[in-house]
């Protein structure tokens, strides 16, 4: 459920996951430390990184004060080595199914490079499009905050060999299928970058 302040009375679960250092409200921390209950396992999920500090910090305890005594928060760092928290991958992540061309009513032309674009709204779209236009390219622009500025950057620009298509909102499954169908994927955000890596065509 979505939380709002003041926080309603909520009993902590056996495991509490705090994402990216966003501390739970003090009243919830106190509930976690109540003497009448066993303290939950408190995990601080950190950002994905390939930096050396990930292995140094993964699994470290961090004592936290509360009205009823100290709790322990444990750092969890996703990463790319055995000394990190690793990455999640479901059994069929490397083979999510057939390309979603039929659902999108779209088909790449023979010899056309397929490129997906999921970016921030202030990305340098114009420069990218100029580079992509040097050879036959089907550019698939995902729905979201970047779609409108990306389409605007195409206006009045010689598109040469670039064919752009604005995509509707996709399910995670269909987005995975799209990533696997493309030759190059521009992705933003940890989860999407990892999904592009599983597809074998990240950027």
Where are these regions (language model features)?
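A donor-sugar binding/catalytic signature common to diverse glycosyltransferases
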Residues: 170-203
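Short glycine-/acidic-enriched loop or helix-start segments at secondary-structure transitions
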Residues: 26-30, 54-55, 126-127, 151, ...
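Active-site and donor-binding regions of nucleotide-sugar-utilizing enzymes
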Residues: 1-67, 144
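Short, well-ordered alpha-helix to beta-strand connector turns
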Residues: 12-14, 39, 71-72, 136, ...
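A nucleotide-sugar donor-handling region in carbohydrate enzymes
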Residues: 46-126
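Hydrophobic/aromatic beta-strand patches that form the interior of the parallel beta-sheet core
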Residues: 17, 41-43, 75-78, 140, ...
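Donor-nucleotide binding loops and adjacent catalytic segments primarily
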Residues: 100, 108-176
